[in-house]
């Protein structure tokens, strides 16, 4: 295995795929574009590329130069993973292994775990031999390299090909035991750059060291040389975004519970009204189904013609009768319309029907005064409600990511471990769980109850709100949150790293550009219209900033779980060192072997960060407050905006992985066979000679010197020099 290792490009997509081939999980590689800016998030290590000064790396030996920064203590050197590079062109794998095997919080997989255990306590030279004799590493290394160019014939070896090619080398910067080390496989000892400051991260010191090195190599002009590249080994951002989505969906459920509990406390008489209305619904639906004909819904016709039956049609039908079960599946679904209703849901009677909310909501309309409500009632002002088709749910067709999603589905139940007290007992559950939100009349109290019950089944499905509907009341379906719509952006995959990096990328992703940070939520806007009669104040982000619930809970809504007490107090969940919540009602279930879910890790990390910034004191329970319905709706809008934002980020990461694989296929594909076959076919057809002559003639007409034409300049110089000498005489 000492020969045959190929050169690798300094590309974050290549290194990310190489990490996956090594069997490492939860790690990716990002490119650093700006050394002046601070790195966001945890970083396992840096991989630095620079130009190598020697001519031939195949004949080089490990440098024996030792200075004051070299660590010569065998105990320190052997306890870390530092290996001499004994195989040419293996510096990329050496640099990557130097980062991964010196990090204790990385899932290395079977291959690297076995190597780490086997080489524990070995000398750097022995570790170098272990890397060179690992066929799994060599196979993964060469699988991402460009095809090796063919050697030139011996008669054309006048110029050394090695002298004309520039050689580059990879080294690593890793934090080990509180000190920054530079691990270079071509040096006999690791380089110790010392500890970093108390008020800074290790990445800050590493950036300073790298900038000083670039400045020395370029004579004090660090931005005039592009022969350097820097990459960071970071956690997989897909896992981070999925964990944040789990936390946000649990918090959305908690906010809905708080809103439902507030309505139950303020209006206890509504429960009796709800029961009486439920008893009347079967009779009304039965009479309506016997009198009304079967008609096709206009807004469901395109989807039904293709045979795609959506649950939204059943949800819009409400309590009406369904189509017969013996109907073929390729026929459009028929629904029963109430008497007098048209295809568009508009009553044919010219007299407008006043659509009002239930009495308990109209009496507690916080957006209007009682005088204004009486005027609206006298004028017959109704709220128009138009069905809105939900957007297509996000799905990833990538094969390898589907495997990851299967593991994530198993971990979905981890979000259900956090269950707050005071969960209301909803009524009968409707049969639809399609992830839509329907606000029907007149039982708005069941809106939150049905949505909570559906969300407890599967947190990965967008939560829905469902209420019973009386005859003649139109159904309104609104998606739970605004999904990121794919934009007609440039799908070129020539350079997948152009999609952008989390570390100061100069190019912004088209997905993020198409989605604002805080998109307007159709759920909260529609609920605010139903509850309060207006949504202008909730749609403005500036007004949300000054909302009390958003101001108190907004900074921790995506990093920590919310706890709803029995008295309606909503507060963030404080975690102790053991990872268990201070509230007895919300406790994470400890898994086997002490493993924790991504949700628990995210919550612990978020709590630690809040303790560092002074937001939370260790061991101190977090105080909560009661909020008004309008404040809870603003908080719900904030949660759904964060969900939409993280879903866009997750989709961006998935698309970036896809383009990484496309680039890798283009990089590793051998085009020589196709080129040789094409040229041989041209020669067989007698077209090759003519094409060569045409190419040569075009170059001559363009003034390009061919062959020995440039040697005619010497006689011209002698002719010009003779008159000059004669004039001097």
From Swiss-Prot:
The record marks 85 as: Transition state stabilizer. Residues 395-409 have a biased composition (Acidic residues). Changing residue 56 to C: Reduces deubiquitination activity towards H2AK119ub1 substrates in the context of the nucleosome. A motif (HBM-like motif) lies at residues 363-366. Residues 713-729 are annotated as: Positively charged C-terminal extension (CTE). Changing residue 91 to A: Abolishes deubiquitinase activity. Has no effect on interaction with HCFC1. Changing residue 315 to A: Found in a malignant pleural mesothelioma sample. A motif (Classical bipartite Nuclear localization signal (NLS)) lies at residues 699-722. Changing residue 93 to A: In TPDS1; significantly increased risk for renal cell carcinoma. It comes from the Eukaryota. Changing residue 700 to Q: Slightly reduces deubiquitination activity towards H2AK119ub1 substrates in the context of the nucleosome. Ubiquitinated: monoubiquitinated at multiple sites within its nuclear localization signal (NLS) BY UBE2O, leading to cytoplasmic retention. Able to mediate autodeubiquitination via intramolecular interactions to counteract cytoplasmic retention. Monoubiquitinated on at least 4 sites near or within its PY-NLS. A motif (Non-classical PY-nuclear localization signal (PY-NLS)) lies at residues 717-724. Changing residue 91 to R: In KURIS; loss-of-function variant; unable to rescue impaired H2AK119ub deubiquitination when expressed in BAP1-deficient cells; does not affect localization to the nucleus. It catalyses: Thiol-dependent hydrolysis of ester, thioester, amide, peptide and isopeptide bonds formed by the C-terminal Gly of ubiquitin (a 76-residue protein attached to proteins as an intracellular targeting signal). Gene3D superfamilies: 1.20.58.860, Peptidase C12, ubiquitin carboxyl-terminal hydrolase. Belongs to the peptidase C12 family. BAP1 subfamily. Deubiquitinating enzyme that plays a key role in chromatin by mediating deubiquitination of histone H2A and HCFC1. Catalytic component of the polycomb repressive deubiquitinase (PR-DUB) complex, a complex that specifically mediates deubiquitination of histone H2A monoubiquitinated at 'Lys-120' (H2AK119ub1). Does not deubiquitinate monoubiquitinated histone H2B. The PR-DUB complex is an epigenetic regulator of gene expression and acts as a transcriptional coactivator, affecting genes involved in development, cell communication, signaling, cell proliferation and cell viability. May act as a tumor suppressor. It is linked to Mesothelioma, malignant: An aggressive neoplasm of the serosal lining of the chest. It appears as broad sheets of cells, with some regions containing spindle-shaped, sarcoma-like cells and other regions showing adenomatous patterns. Pleural mesotheliomas have been linked to exposure to asbestos. This is Ubiquitin carboxyl-terminal hydrolase BAP1. The gene is BAP1.
């Amino acid at each position: 295995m000492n020969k045959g290792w190929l050169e690798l490009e300094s590309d974050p997509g290549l290194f990310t795929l190489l990490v996956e081939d090594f069997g490492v999980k939860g790690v990716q590689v990002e490119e650093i574009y700006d050394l002046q800016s601070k790195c966001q998030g945890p970083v396992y290590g840096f991989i630095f590329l620079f130009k190598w000064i020697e001519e031939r790396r195949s004949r080089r030996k490990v440098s024996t130069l030792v200075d004051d920064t070299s660590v010569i203590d065998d105990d320190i050197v052997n306890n870390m993973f530092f290996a001499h590079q004994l195989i040419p062109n293996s510096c990329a794998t050496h640099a990557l292994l130097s980062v991964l095997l010196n990090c204790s919080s990385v899932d290395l997989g079977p291959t690297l775990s076995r190597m780490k255990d086997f080489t524990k306590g070995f000398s750097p030279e022995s570790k170098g031999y272990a890397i060179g004799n690992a066929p799994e590493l060599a196979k993964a290394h060469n699988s991402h390299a460009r095809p090796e160019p063919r050697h030139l014939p011996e008669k054309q070896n006048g110029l050394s090909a090695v002298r004309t090619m520039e050689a580059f080398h990879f080294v690593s910067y890793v934090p080990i035991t509180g000190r920054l080390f530079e691990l270079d496989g071509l040096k006999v000892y690791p380089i110790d750059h010392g500890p970093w400051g108390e008020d800074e991260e290790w990445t800050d010191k590493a950036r300073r060291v790298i900038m000083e090195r670039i400045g020395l190599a370029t004579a004090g002009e660090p931005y005039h040389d592009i022969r350097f590249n820097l990459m960071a080994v970071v956690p997989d951002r897909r896992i981070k975004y999925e964990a944040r989505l789990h936390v946000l969906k649990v918090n959305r459920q908690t906010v809905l519970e708080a809103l439902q509990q507030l309505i139950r406390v303020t209006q206890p008489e509504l429960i009796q009204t709800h029961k009486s209305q439920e008893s009347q619904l079967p009779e009304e639906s039965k009479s309506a189904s016997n009198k009304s004909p079967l008609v096709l819904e206009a807004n469901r016709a395109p989807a039904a013609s293709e045979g795609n039956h959506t649950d939204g049609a059943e949800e819009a039908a409400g309590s009406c009768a369904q189509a017969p079960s013996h109907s073929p599946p390729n026929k459009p679904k028929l629904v029963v319309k109430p008497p007098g209703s048209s295809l568009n849901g508009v009553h044919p009677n010219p007299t407008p029907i006043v659509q009002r909310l239930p009495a308990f909501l109209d009496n507690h309309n916080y957006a209007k005064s009682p005088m204004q409500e009486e005027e609206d009632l006298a004028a017959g002002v109704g709220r128009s409600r138009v069905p809105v088709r939900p957007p297509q749910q996000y799905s990833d067709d990538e094969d390898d990511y589907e495997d990851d999603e299967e593991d994530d589905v198993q971990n979905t139940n981890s979000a259900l471990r956090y269950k707050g007290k005071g969960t209301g007992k909803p009524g009968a559950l409707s049969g639809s769980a399609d992830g839509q939100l329907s606000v029907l009349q007149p039982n708005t109290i069941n809106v939150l109850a049905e949505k909570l019950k559906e969300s407890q089944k599967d947190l990965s499905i967008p939560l829905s709100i469902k209420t019973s509907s009386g005859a003649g009341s139109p159904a309104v379906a609104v998606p739970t949150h605004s999904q990121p719509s794919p934009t007609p952006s440039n799908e070129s995959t020539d350079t997948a790293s152009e999609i952008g990096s989390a570390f100061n990328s100069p190019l912004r992703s088209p997905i993020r550009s198409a989605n604002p940070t805080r998109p307007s939520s159709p759920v909260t806007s529609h609920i605010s219209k139903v509850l309060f009669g207006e949504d202008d104040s909730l749609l403005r982000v500036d007004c949300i900033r000054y909302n009390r619930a958003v101001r108190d809970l907004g900074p921790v809504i995506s990093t920590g779980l919310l706890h709803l007490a029995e008295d309606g107090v909503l507060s963030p969940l404080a975690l102790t060192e053991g990872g268990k919540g201070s509230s007895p009602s919300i406790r994470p279930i400890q898994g086997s072997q002490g493993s924790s879910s991504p949700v628990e890790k995210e919550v612990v990390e978020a709590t630690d960060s809040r303790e560092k910034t002074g937001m939370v004191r260790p061991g101190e329970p977090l105080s909560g407050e009661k909020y008004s319905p309008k404040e809870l709706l603003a908080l719900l809008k904030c949660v759904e905006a964060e969900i939409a934002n993280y879903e866009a980020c997750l989709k961006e990461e998935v698309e970036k992985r896809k383009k990484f694989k496309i680039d890798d296929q283009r990089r590793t594909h051998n085009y020589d066979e196709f080129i040789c076959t094409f040229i041989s076919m041209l020669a067989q057809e007698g077209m090759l000679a003519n094409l060569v002559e045409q190419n040569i003639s075009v170059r001559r007409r363009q003034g390009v010197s061919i062959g020995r034409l440039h040697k005619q300049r010497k006689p011209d110089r002698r002719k010009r020099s003779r008159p000059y000498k004669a004039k001097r005489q």
